[in-house]
Amino acid sequence: MSQVYDSLSVPQGFQAAGTYSGLCSSRVKLDVAMIVSRRDCSIVTATSQGLMTQSGKVLLLHNGTALPDGPRGHEISQEVCQAAGKCMDEAPDDIALVASGAKGQYFRPSLLIHSLKTLTAGLGTDSQPLEAVLDNAGDVTAYQVALSSGTPGCSLSGVAADGTADSDGLCVIMTDAQAGSAVIEGALAQAKAAIDTENFTFIVMANGMAGNAEITAEGADFTAFMQALNTVTVHLCRAIAGDGEGA
């Protein structure tokens, strides 16, 4: 099936790239993405197992094979993040690894590590490589909104794709608004409550490059941020479901 990807620019301060690592033998499309922020950003990952939060500059996202549970998964994450840090001259703690896909499969971190130079060389402001990595069956969709109220110049860009019988759906949202992990968690929880997000993994990154005052858990700015995140999330998930309504 031929898939034509939307031409969507990522928010300011972000760059993205994608390549094929070969980690998942059943996947012939691009399977690993890199998103880099020019400055530290809040990274919130919400899965069916719970929430993970961290501050950093780099996200590595593999679609195809899930990390093993337990200590081995932690060891792989450390190994890949250390290699990425060395490749990019960043601290390993500033790098996040998310791997979504079939569980119980053999996971070769060396294949992700060998992809790092290709990813860093391909970084750009187009979302198409990220969309290609998320794509499972021609179902990928992208959407972008601008924030209103007291956050002029801020935007949110989202890319999502449905899951398969073996793996969760994926939704990645980037924003140049300045928002901490707690604010993102609160806004994301309200957005997820509006739709069926079971078996979906959400990743939200906020880098503050728009220069707005930090959004707190109360007030008009938080309301605008929550509404924007809700709009993007609902639009993407409904588009995947095929009802054509968006938000």
Task: Spell out what each predicted region is.
Residues 1-247:
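A structural signal for small-residue-enriched, beta-sheet-centric alpha/beta enzyme cores
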